[in-house]
Every structure is written in C-alpha cells, then in structure tokens.
C-alpha cells in the first residue's frame, strides 16, 4: 500500500507534517476515508477528529473546522484550530468546556449569540475526546 504526505496547518503555523497510509476526516457531507490514489477534492471540515493511520498505529488531531484538499498523494488540511492529542492539556480543555456551557446557558437566557457559544462547546468537547484517545 502507498502512502500520503499529510500536512495540517492553522493560522498559527503547522501542527502536523508526516506520512500516513490513510486519513479519515468528517466533512460537512459526512466522513471521508482518504487512501493513496484518491480523486482530487476540496471539502469543508466539521469540528471533529482527523484520524491518521500511520505505521505505528493511529494519531488523532482535534480540528476546529477548516478545509481539506486532496491532490495526488498529498493531503493538506487548513484548519481554523488544530491540536494533536498529545499536545492537549486536559485541564484546560475541561475548563474551556465549562466556560462554554456557562456561556451557552447565559446565551439562551439573554438571547445573545448562542451559535458562538455552541461552537466553543463543540471545540472543547472535541479536544477532550481527542485527549481521551491517548
């Protein structure tokens, strides 16, 4: 089986650069599994885990939305935010989840930006889920 050159970058810089046998990501249209030789595509990503099948097993990266581009043996992910599972501080993620839940509760009561509070909560839960995998 061939391999894919994978790059995950955010506005703050690169998060992952490496080789994988498969990339699994959740797009707005559903979950996609990318293998070497996949047809070219560009797809918007949801807040979720990107799973990378590598020789040593599987690596998880929590992404906060963005886009995935597949071209030949290259997979480039341009993420709004991204953290590798080993880089996630679980205490910080739990506190972010608590803040987001409080903000969401306040948003419902005061009719303020509920969408932003929902996004913050989704990102915090996603980070916790990725860290629990390690």
UniProtKB/Swiss-Prot annotation:
A GO-annotated cellular component: proton-transporting ATP synthase complex
One MF term in the entry's GO annotations: proton-transporting ATP synthase activity, rotational mechanism
Principal location: membrane
SUPFAM superfamilies documented for this protein: Epsilon subunit of F1F0-ATP synthase C-terminal domain, Epsilon subunit of F1F0-ATP synthase N-terminal domain
Keywords: ATP synthesis, Cell membrane, CF(1), Hydrogen ion transport, Ion transport, Membrane, Transport
Localization in the cell: Cell membrane
Record family assignment: Belongs to the ATPase epsilon chain family.
UniProt subunit comment: F-type ATPases have 2 components, CF(1) - the catalytic core - and CF(0) - the membrane proton channel. CF(1) has five subunits: alpha(3), beta(3), gamma(1), delta(1), epsilon(1). CF(0) has three main subunits: a, b and c.
PANTHER family named among the record's database cross-references: ATP SYNTHASE DELTA/EPSILON CHAIN, ATP SYNTHASE EPSILON CHAIN, CHLOROPLASTIC
Protein known as: ATP synthase epsilon chain
Biological source species: Listeria welshimeri serovar 6b (strain ATCC 35897 / DSM 20650 / CCUG 15529 / CIP 8149 / NCTC 11857 / SLCC 5334 / V8)
Origin organism lineage: Bacteria, Bacillati, Bacillota, Bacilli, Bacillales
């Amino acid at each position: 089986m061939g391999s894919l050159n994978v790059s995950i970058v955010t506005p703050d810089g690169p998060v992952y650069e490496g080789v994988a046998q498969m990339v699994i990501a959740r797009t707005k249209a559903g979950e996609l599994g990318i293998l070497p030789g996949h047809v070219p595509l560009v797809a918007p990503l949801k807040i979720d885990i990107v799973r990378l099948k590598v020789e040593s097993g599987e690596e998880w990266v929590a992404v906060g939305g963005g886009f995935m581009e597949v071209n030949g043996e290259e997979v480039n992910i341009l993420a709004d935010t991204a953290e590798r599972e080993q880089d996630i501080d679980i205490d910080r993620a739990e506190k972010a989840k608590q803040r987001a839940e409080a903000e969401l509760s306040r948003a419902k009561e005061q009719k303020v930006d509920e969408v932003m509070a929902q996004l913050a909560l989704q990102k915090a839960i996603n980070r916790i889920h990725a860290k629990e995998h390690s």
